[in-house]
């Protein structure tokens, strides 16, 4: 074989090897795999309902289209599922957590949380907006949001001392200077809402499905309660923004400014802001075990980005969840996460003391 022919064969074979993908390159990371989709609250609740809608539509956007298997892991206010993801789940890319309020627990240093959530890869979060309402017959009468500062002493109902719901409304009320009695321990917002209807308590707050689905048609339109504000929502840079889900309402900071002519300030407001980002902007969070392969993290982030534009998913969500899901993905989500996880030790200590004071 002469030199020219040998050179031609060598070049030809080299080109073939370059344009022919290897079996590994052809096979997506998730092809033929199952993904355990861990939901940190019990079946039938809001987290479970939303999580299962996400799982149903997410798989088709993951290269390789794995099978997503929802699994409820309730307990300790949602912390049991978080501990499982951080301590037990294998970092093989085949476990995805879909959690309510993880960063709120980290910020409050919940004793039962044994893991550092900053070590768990962030995938995406879904924003949740909470609307606060009070009975209209609280003396001397609540007809509009700014009337709240005129209210005589009333009873405000929550779920537990260290829940994000209770923390946020207590901080907001203190900032406004309201006179109220704190009642907590209701098993759910359904129970608290019934207590409002019976006038056992006069205040509660709920997320979009509960507000749009029940409170608005049954209590607002009948004049029983008046919505006063929704908890603040922030941009990834930490700037206050209006919620497109409630164009007819104002945020807490907007109502405060209308009443007092200036924006709120101080450590309670800083604590409220951090709690709102942790519980509102990052109300539901998808995350993975520490050490998960980067290609798995990237694939799922891309899948959530595609899911956020999936009209079929959005239609299902609007039908069941009563709102248009708004995602924080990638760098935007990371910036918000850092604002919560890197709050000052002084602020963390203040929040813990604030919660403990309520127990006494």
Locate each region found by the language model:
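Hinge/capping helix and adjacent helix->loop/strand transition within the periplasmic-binding protein
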Residues: 29, 35, 60-65, 84-95, ...
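An extracytoplasmic/periplasmic, membrane-proximal ligand-sensing/linker region
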Residues: 31-33, 221-228, 237, 247, ...
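A ligand-binding cleft/hinge motif common to bilobed small-molecule-binding domains
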Residues: 101-112, 166, 170-175, 203-263
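Bacterial N-terminal signal peptides
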Residues: 6-18
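Sec/Tat signal peptide C-region and signal peptidase I cleavage site
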Residues: 20-24
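Extracytoplasmic "Venus flytrap"
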Residues: 37-52, 74-77, 157-164
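Ligand-binding clamshell of periplasmic/extracellular solute-binding protein-like
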Residues: 50, 54, 76-79, 93-106, ...
């Amino acid at each position: 074989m002469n030199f020219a022919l040998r050179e031609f064969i060598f070049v030809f074979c080299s080109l073939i090897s370059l344009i022919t993908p290897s079996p590994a390159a052809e096979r997506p990371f998730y092809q033929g795999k199952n993904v355990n989709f861990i939901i940190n609250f019990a079946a039938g609740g809001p987290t479970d309902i939303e999580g299962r809608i996400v799982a149903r539509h997410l798989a088709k956007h993951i290269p390789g289209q794995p099978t997503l298997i929802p699994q409820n892991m309730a307990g300790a206010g949602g912390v049991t599922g978080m501990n499982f993801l951080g301590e037990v789940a294998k970092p093989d890319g085949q476990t995805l957590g879909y959690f309510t309020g993880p960063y709120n627990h980290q910020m409050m240093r919940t004793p039962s949380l044994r893991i550092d959530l900053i070590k768990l890869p962030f995938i995406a979060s879904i924003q949740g907006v909470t609307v606060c309402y009070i009975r209209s017959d609280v003396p001397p009468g609540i007809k509009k949001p700014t009337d709240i500062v005129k209210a005589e002493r009333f009873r405000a109902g929550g779920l537990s001392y260290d829940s994000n719901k209770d923390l946020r409304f207590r901080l907001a009320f203190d900032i406004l200077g309201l006179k109220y009695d704190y009642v907590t321990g209701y098993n759910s917002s359904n129970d608290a809402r019934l207590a409002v209807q019976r006038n056992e308590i006069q205040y509660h707050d709920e997320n979009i499905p509960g507000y749009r689905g029940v409170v608005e048609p049954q209590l607002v339109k009948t004049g029983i309660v008046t919505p006063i504000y929704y908890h603040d929502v922030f941009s990834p840079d930490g700037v206050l923004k209006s919620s497109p889900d409630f164009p007819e309402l104002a945020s807490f900071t907007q109502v405060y400014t209308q009443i007092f002519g200036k924006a709120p300030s101080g450590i309670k407001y800083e604590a409220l802001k951090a709690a709102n980002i942790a519980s509102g902007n990052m109300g539901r969070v998808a995350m993975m075990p520490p050490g998960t392969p980067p290609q798995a993290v990237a694939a799922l982030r891309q899948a959530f980005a595609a899911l956020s534009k999936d009209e079929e998913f959005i239609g299902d969500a609007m039908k069941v969840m009563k709102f248009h899901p708004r995602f924080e993905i990638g760098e935007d989500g990371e910036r918000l996460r850092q604002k919560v996880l890197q709050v000052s030790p002084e602020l963390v200590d203040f929040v813990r003391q604030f919660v403990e004071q309520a127990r006494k």
